């Protein structure tokens, strides 16, 4: 983005903000008022940043002009030069802040999320690690004040999870958790290991935006719904009614099966929630792929087959391979203190997008 178009963009945004302010003051009502109010609120953050940036630019210009005054004494000149240095130091940060606010918004960022964790390579140890990851995200959600609801769970005999999913409700949940998608690897000595050897296992995390019926319309004709008796470990039937539900979205082939609840109705409702999220995410993935192909390069690092993070318990470290960040605080991270990683990943994503402008 060249200087001229950047400046023009800022002027247009400020003009639109003023127009909306006048519109809201004119006594409009109904849907027009609701729409204008939302637009006005959406612009408040960027307008505040633009005003701070413009103020610093104006002060710098004023200080440079004042510096040219021939009648200035030495002390005043030194004071002005210090002010100029401070303003010149602050301008790049303020400009970057404005540019970040101008970046296209991911429409899913404000949504709640569904998180799915599956044990990968490593047998029982992988299932135990999947359970530990699940507890880590549950604790993170608690620290953020988000609502955490288990949707489905497939347990092993000793406390591990073959597969588990949950709904995490709150403001901007997806924007915080979307970079957690991928393969998480653990290196540790299993409790069952008598020789003290370090084992490596893995679990896959998928984070999907939670969508409502208004976002993804599911037509009845596009769904195949099968019901069957729920089964427990070893395949034995655990009840006598067809409470388990399998829903297939025929156009995409995406299937969700749930049997956690005793009620068929509850299993169906949860399955539809997960199905909507998976269809929505598949549509987002296709759009991202199209944009990437248009630029002839892959966008970001959200490939779920990619190893993104390693948790090394003997060394007490957690390493995120996408941003080369290693923290020697594994206990804190496993207990839900993820902000240091999440904030660094968001900053890295913003930097990539800024480089494309």
From Swiss-Prot:
Subcellular location: Cytoplasm
Positions bearing N5-methylglutamine: 236
Entries under PROSITE patterns matching the protein: RF_PROK_I
Biased segments, Basic and acidic residues type: 283-309
Annotated keywords: Cytoplasm, Methylation, Protein biosynthesis
GO molecular function, one term: translation release factor activity, codon specific
GO cellular component: cytoplasm
Superkingdom of the organism of origin: Bacteria
Region (Disordered): 283-313
Modification after translation (UniProt): Methylated by PrmC. Methylation increases the termination efficiency of RF1.
Record-linked NCBIfam families: prfA, PRK00591.1
Family assignment from sequence similarity: Belongs to the prokaryotic/mitochondrial release factor family.
PANTHER family: LD18447P
Role this protein plays: Peptide chain release factor 1 directs the termination of translation in response to the peptide chain termination codons UAG and UAA.
UniProt-recorded name of the protein: Peptide chain release factor 1
Organism: Rickettsia bellii (strain OSU 85-389)
Lineage, highest ranks first: Bacteria, Pseudomonadati, Pseudomonadota, Alphaproteobacteria, Rickettsiales
Gene name in the database record: prfA
